[in-house]
Amino acid sequence: MNPLLILAFLGAAVATPTDDDDKIVGGYTCEENSVPYQVSLNAGYHFCGGSLISDQWVVSAAHCYKSRIQVRLGEYNIDVLEGNEQFINSAKVIRHPNYNSWILDNDIMLIKLSSPAVLNARVATISLPRACAAPGTQCLISGWGNTLSSGTNYPELLQCLDAPILTQAQCEASYPGQITENMICAGFLEGGKDSCQGDSGGPVVCNGELQGIVSWGYGCAQKNKPGVYTKVCNFVDWIQSTIAANS
């Protein structure tokens, strides 16, 4: 089933994944400054997450694309100006050339900041993966968004969830015919804990490396429907070559 249709069946206000906020269910409030690579993508409102991979580049999901984005770094309480945030406009927003919005394959994009971020205790980069993460690897998923599987409760403070990478067989069995080689699943087949559309674009970090980008899923924290994430290890060459060509 097409993920766009899945969202429509869920009663989403708009039957596209573009503006879906994250829904971390069964997680916990992150410690302040513990996820310094997490960014908020803003268009007058928070609409997606992302990850800072250098002082001038952010990686997110291609389905979060907007031609102009303000990247907000150093955020913790997203509703309050705490004084340590950096708000930097995008200079370039580059979707993967093979991004498929119908099946959400190659769901990755890069954002070049108009000026370099100042790196400090609240704003730091996350490493790209040196290899793909093995099934069973424990990862940290983070974002701001709905913490309820039904109904809405948008938290002010950044939310975290610890979740394992699932096997590709488990992933494909959960979503028959929908999983490509550029996707991984993470979470709990028994349900109860999940990032539901995740802060679309937000990070999945395993052992200090960015292994996933929140991409799509069916419902939130449902049994046998784990979150689906862009498999970042497949895109390291594209990320590096794109940055080099646009430096």
Swiss-Prot record:
The UniProt GO MF terms for this protein read: calcium ion binding; serine-type endopeptidase activity
What are the required cofactors? Ca(2+)
| Signal peptide coordinates | 1-15
For the ligand (Ca(2+)), the binding residues are E75, N77, V80, E85
Q: Which residues form the Peptidase S1 domain?
A: 24-244
Cross-referenced SMART domains, in alphabetical order? Answer: Tryp_SPc (SM00020)
Q: Which cysteines are joined by disulfide bonds?
A: C30-C160, C48-C64, C132-C233, C139-C206, C171-C185, C196-C220
Site described as Required for specificity, located at: D194
Q: What is its EC number?
A: 3.4.21.4
Domain of life per record:
Eukaryota
Residues forming the catalytic site: H63 (charge relay system), D107 (charge relay system), S200 (charge relay system)
Kindly indicate whether the keyword Magnesium belongs to this entry: no
Q: Which CDD domains does the record cross-reference, listed alphabetically?
A: Tryp_SPc
Q: Where in the cell is it found?
A: Secreted, Extracellular space
The catalysed reaction is:
Preferential cleavage: Arg-|-Xaa, Lys-|-Xaa
- Note accompanying the cofactor annotation: Binds 1 Ca(2+) ion per subunit.
Query: Which major enzyme category is it?
Result: hydrolase
Q: Where does the protein principally reside?
A: secreted
Keywords for this entry?
Calcium, Digestion, Disulfide bond, Hydrolase, Metal-binding, Protease, Secreted, Serine protease, Signal, Zymogen
Q: Which family does it belong to?
A: Belongs to the peptidase S1 family.
The name this protein goes by in its record: Anionic trypsin
